[in-house]
Amino acid sequence: MNANIWVAASDGNLDRVEHILRESKGAMTPQSKDINGYTPMHAAAAYGHLDLLKKMCNEYNGDINVLDNDGDTPLHHVEDVATARLIVEELGGDFTIRNVEGQTPYDSFVENGEDGELIEYMRIKSGVADVHGVDGVQGEGVIDSKLLEEFKDNVRYTLENDPEEGADEATLQRRRQLEQIITGDNAEEELERYIRAMVREQMLGQGSMAGSGDEPDSKRRK
């Protein structure tokens, strides 16, 4: 029965995981390792089972920074930004821990080519400079922090001072999108992501902040 806890955690079967933890009377925990050091915590993180992660951490003393045999934390195994946010912002995950190869979770995500939004979120959280430019575009695409802040200030000024009267539909749509970003829960991160997408679009000749109303489909994030 106990051997199935890793499968149950991978499947997000919360009831099954809880049953195993209770029935084992302490023999199995969220930190219990298989032969590779893989734990239920790693499994739940890898498959994005948020409720299970919260349950194991909050009710069963789960260690969100437990290491497997490769020195990976559950955060190293994450594949989506929602799970990363939960681990870092709610469960106390340490994004500075390096595995046996010397990689932080951010380093690992970049090497493995994980989801772009996940990489960007961890880059910002880790305080890593965008040395490769906007979303990986090199050369003139690099936006330093000072220029980025100027972009942000310009956006805010435009929203506060430019009238809507007489604006075309594309401009109004862009304005509404920016207003939603500014008033959202993660305004700074979302605004930075929006600006980087717009600059990248301009670089690729697909439009500009002044001329194109929408972000490319590939840049839209849920």
Curated annotation (Swiss-Prot):
Gene3D superfamilies: Ankyrin repeat-containing domain (1.25.40.20). ANK repeats lie at residues 1-29, 36-66, 70-99. Pfam families: Ank_2. GO terms for cellular component: cytoplasm; nucleus. Keywords: ANK repeat, Repeat. PROSITE patterns: ANK_REP_REGION (PS50297), ANK_REPEAT (PS50088). The keyword Repeat applies. Present with 784 molecules/cell in log phase SD medium. This is Ankyrin repeat-containing protein YCR051W.
